[in-house]
Amino acid sequence: IVSARVMKLDPRRGGITVEIDGSEAYLLKSEQVPGEIYTEGDIIKVYVVGVSETDRGPRIMISRTHPGLVKRLFENEVPEIYDGLIEVKSISREAGSRTKIAVWSKDENIDAVGACIGPKGIRVAKIVEELGGEKIDVVKYSEEPEQFIAAALSPADVLEVTILDEESHSCRV
């Protein structure tokens, strides 16, 4: 994650030119969160997807919708993730709407979900704020597909999960 300053809006294509430590990058419309409004001079956090070499020099590919942005925000906010005590197993994101993040710890004494949410929800609240109010569900990861599926579908009450076919990853809930 890097901080970028909005330099110029492109109303024709919907993209945004930003400055990152003296270098320019272009945030494509497809990499912006629906509903977010940017103005020149805004400082925004972006995820660096990659850097490629072009005829005109290096090109920085950035995103506000990539699940990696959420992962890095959690690493910044939750020391247990940064230190490796808690592992982010998977992230499913519908940018601007909802994110589900599955977390796990080898140490049974660590409440991975509770640590990510933080006292009185303060840790996850900071991430929600950075993502413009996007809802975030932190769920406990399990190696048992039935348990993990039930947790991932929260807040819905799941009565039963039946694995129909391991190969095609199909189940009945």
Where in the sequence are the language-model features?
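RNA-contacting regions in translation and RNA-metabolism proteins
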Residues: 1-173
